[in-house]
Regions:
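A structural connector/turn signal
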Residues: 24-25, 72, 151-154
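Catalytic nucleophile loop of clan PA
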Residues: 76-97
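Extracytoplasmic
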Residues: 6-10, 18-20, 31, 53-58, ...
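Conserved active-site neighborhood of the chymotrypsin/trypsin-like protease fold
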Residues: 1-48, 66-70, 132, 136-146, ...
Length: 192
């Protein structure tokens, strides 16, 4: 871990496996109503080892409680999407997925379940962290006009090459899971 920003829930990691793939960061950030795509590994690799993509829009330029470091998106995200890229239709990074609305809390407060209420850290927060860590990155210049020349499928395929699966382990959790698995195995053997 090179840098950990607990407030924004972002960590900068260094890998011994360096690839040539990267995602340019949008210099002009996100715009409300902008089409977006989210890539990630919802529920880890339990569904499949292939990354998944969902589509949506930027719903608001602030997160919960007017949090200016976040934006609200309506693209579907699940556990396992956290840390994944949020890109615009040009393949530029405009955010990093971070959270979804807590159904139980929202139901207790409003007596209704939230739909498509998800959040991402804005790319500006990421560039602040990268700058503070003296890590170089590439931005794209603001583009005021989009002529639709980009093929979205090709754009997503390029970003997919730079999206990696990351599995985090806690020795305490791993030991607990190992004990539970062993207990299930003993129960199975004893019942036969």
């Amino acid at each position: 871990i090179i840098r950990n920003d607990i407030v924004n829930d972002i960590a900068i990691l260094k890998s011994s496996k360096i690839g040539n793939e990267y995602i340019k960061i949008a210099d002009d950030g996100a715009m409300k109503g902008e089409d977006i795509f989210v890539l990630g590994y919802p529920h880890g690799k339990h569904l499949s080892s292939e990354s998944k993509v969902t589509k949506g829009v930027v719903s608001a330029l602030q997160g919960l409680g007017n949090n200016y470091s976040q934006m609200q998106i309506d693209a579907a995200i699940q556990p396992g999407n956290s840390g994944g890229p949020v890109i615009n239709d040009k393949g530029e990074l405009i955010g990093v997925t971070v959270a979804t609305a807590d159904y139980e809390v929202m139901f207790d407060m409003f007596k209704s379940l939230p739909q498509n209420m998800n959040f991402a850290i804005k790319s500006q927060m990421l560039t602040n962290i990268l700058d503070g860590s003296k890590i170089s990155y590439e931005t794209s210049k603001p583009s005021w006009f989009s002529f639709g020349s980009n093929d979205v499928k090709e754009t997503v395929a390029e970003v997919d090459k730079a999206t990696v699966y990351l599995e985090c382990w806690s020795t305490e959790i791993a030991m607990k899971e190992a004990k539970e698995s062993a207990a299930k195995l003993v129960d199975t053997v004893n019942s036969e």
